A protein has these predicted regions:
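Weak global preference for isoleucine
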Residues: 4, 10, 19, 28, ...
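Intrinsically disordered, low-complexity boundary segments flanking structured domains
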Residues: 9-10, 30-35, 56, 98, ...
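Generic detector of short, locally flexible boundary/turn motifs and exposed helical patches
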Residues: 11-13, 77, 87, 103-106, ...
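Short, low-complexity intrinsically disordered segments
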Residues: 28-31, 90, 98, 199, ...
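Active-site-proximal binding-pocket segments
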Residues: 128, 132-322
Length: 369
């Protein structure tokens, strides 16, 4: 909404100077005010939003061909991008640049490789953090290096199967997030479900810092948080695991997680980030039910079966056998000794008991009913 107001101010400023202004939608497949229910109200559930609202509406425009000629606007302004000093004075971002190549050309190349290799098993493969069945195009999409129209039609032209349909439905979730933000401008700070305003969140700075640093003692959580810190990105499966752990096992307000992701993600997107955190907390639109609490141990066993993801980001656990990799606190001492692991020293003890904290969360959420 604030961007709409900004654009209106720019248009008004230029109109006063007899400059014709035209604006075009290049960030979304559908404008958020276009997709609404028959009674004119916004959708609150994704499936009807996407299937009835989006897919029954005018199809998104196909990508335009590259212009053969650009008419350069002549201006007396002489500032360059470097003059704006957008980069930090202390170049902490250099380590992130090992994981990303900026620009449209690389985005197009990444998308082509995804269509050739990743999309064939996208529906199932996208759940495995160590595999490469996701496009990892979200930063390029966020910064406008690719448009959602290019992704939509690029996938559609690749053929028709359940994997392509599922990929397009994920773009639909992005549209749903923007619809929520458009209709709820305070999405990043205010519960969509007002009953959560009285939820008994716990303020625990020590646990919050441990979560941010990937030092919770729960390997699947720590791997996700370290991936975020080291690369500026986190696999979506991991986002759900670390989010559930924060708001349900630790009972820390979802807004703390939203702010941390906003500060650290290369693809930090106000609509997606806010809606995603409200979804995992259970207070958003079409949210996960309160009793859905991700068990990071079983999630690791199922979606990182060979332990590659955890071992990549938690090298201190590299020698721990798979049986105990996701729950090292259950390993016999001789197993930990052989793996050069000493809990509390080389790797933290868990900051919460998963079973006890789960029961505590269920009790807290039930109090809202």
């Amino acid at each position: 909404p604030w961007r709409i107001k900004r654009d209106e101010k720019i248009k008004a400023y230029l109109a006063k100077r007899n400059i014709e202004v035209k604006s075009f939608n290049n960030a979304l497949l559908w404008e958020p005010w276009e997709i609404k229910k028959d009674d004119g109200s916004p959708y609150k559930v994704f499936t009807p939003f996407f299937r009835k609202g989006c897919l029954n509406y005018t199809p998104p425009r196909e990508p335009l061909d590259s212009p053969k000629k650009l008419n350069i606007f002549q201006s007396s302004l002489s500032k360059s991008i470097d003059d704006l000093k957008l980069l930090p004075s202390v170049r902490w971002d250099k380590s992130l640049m090992q994981h990303w190549i900026i620009g449209e050309a690389h985005a197009q190349d990444r998308f082509s490789k995804f269509l050739a290799i990743g999309i064939g098993n996208y529906k199932e493969g996208r759940n495995y953090p160590s595999d490469h069945f996701v496009s990892r195009l979200s930063p390029h999409l966020h910064f406008g290096e690719m448009s959602p129209n290019q992704l939509w039609y690029g996938a559609k032209h690749a053929g028709e199967n359940k994997n392509i349909d599922h990929f397009c439905s994920e773009l639909g979730w992005r549209e749903f997030s923007y619809s929520q933000l458009y209709n709820n401008p305070n999405l990043s700070t205010r519960n969509l479900q007002s009953k959560f305003d009285s939820f008994p969140w716990i303020k625990n700075e020590t646990n919050l810092i441990a979560w941010k640093r990937g030092l919770t003692g729960v390997p699947m959580v720590d791997a996700g948080m370290r991936e975020l810190w080291q690369t500026g990105y986190m696999h979506n499966r991991s986002r759900m695991i670390v989010g559930s752990f924060l708001v349900k096992n630790l009972l820390i307000d979802w807004r703390e997680g939203e702010r941390w992701f906003w500060d650290t993600l290369c693809d930090a997107d106000l609509a997606n980030n806010s809606a995603g955190w409200q979804w995992i907390a259970g207070c958003g639109a079409d949210a996960a039910p309160y009793f859905r609490i991700f068990n990071p141990v079983t999630q690791g066993e199922k979606f990182d079966p060979d332990g590659k993801y955890v071992r990549t980001y938690i090298p201190e656990l590299a020698k721990v056998p798979n049986k105990y990799l996701f729950c090292p606190w259950e390993a016999p001492k001789e197993i930990l000794d052989a793996a050069d692991v000493k809990l509390g020293e080389t790797y933290p003890e868990p900051i919460v008991d998963l079973k006890i904290s789960r029961e505590r969360a269920l009790s807290a959420f039930k109090s809202l009913s």
